[in-house]
């Protein structure tokens, strides 16, 4: 008989000797949405400290917000009248999974499409308004987005209204192929007709504004303003660096970089946008 018995390599668990936690199972759970991590300064922030404008109290980073949140921050209470809600995509390519993706985005955002369009008052100034929402398939521009914005410009021409667009997009919607790319030219033509009518068009670039939206109506405003630190560009940074074979500046494609190089007229804090919009619309002969 051996002096020392060999210990088992593993602990055997049976119904009679199952491990029991010494910690109470009634552990309070912290809700997932109680805190938010700032993408810029990496601090964990209590959601209530962000305020309605969703601005980081540590570094002033502007969190991405929904179209409904931006609407609340911008227009006079109860003045918004939504338009063009009956437009549906025909899904021309019968792209696999596209309809399911649309339905999921609608349930998640409460929007029918990636842009909210209508008329509203901002400090008593009546205007045509479009707000793109990056939470809806990254606010990609498909046929419905292009059609809604085009119709908004046509309405603005008929009613002699200024147009204000909050842009945010990942680019053209690949699930709709060439039909998506055609929206760039269609909306740009509507912008030109609105301009020929002597009406004011203001674009507000928000994070992120990229791809076909940047290459068309986002940069065609009579005035172009941007939120601080917004990503604005056409192609991605890595694509450009690979093409030109150069390292780009750290702030490349940021709103501040664009302003420095003359592509943006002004950078305005989110909390100041409502006042700035009202001032610019009134200055350009606004409608009350």
From Swiss-Prot:
Binds 1 zinc ion per subunit. Keywords: ATP-binding, Cytoplasm, Fatty acid biosynthesis, Fatty acid metabolism, Lipid biosynthesis, Lipid metabolism, Metal-binding, Nucleotide-binding, Transferase, Zinc, Zinc-finger. InterPro entries: AcCoA_carboxyl_beta, Acetyl_CoA_COase_Trfase_b_su, ClpP/crotonase-like_dom_sf, COA_CT_N. Component of the acetyl coenzyme A carboxylase (ACC) complex. Biotin carboxylase (BC) catalyzes the carboxylation of biotin on its carrier protein (BCCP) and then the CO(2) group is transferred by the transcarboxylase to acetyl-CoA to form malonyl-CoA. One of its GO terms (molecular function) is carboxyl- or carbamoyltransferase activity. It catalyses: N(6)-carboxybiotinyl-L-lysyl-[protein] + acetyl-CoA = N(6)-biotinyl-L-lysyl-[protein] + malonyl-CoA. PROSITE patterns: COA_CT_NTER (PS50980). Its cofactor is Zn(2+). This is Acetyl-coenzyme A carboxylase carboxyl transferase subunit beta. Zn(2+) binds at residues 38, 41, 56, 59. It is found in: Cytoplasm. It comes from Streptococcus equi subsp. zooepidemicus (strain MGCS10565). Pathway: Lipid metabolism; malonyl-CoA biosynthesis; malonyl-CoA from acetyl-CoA: step 1/1. Residues 34-288 form the CoA carboxyltransferase N-terminal domain.
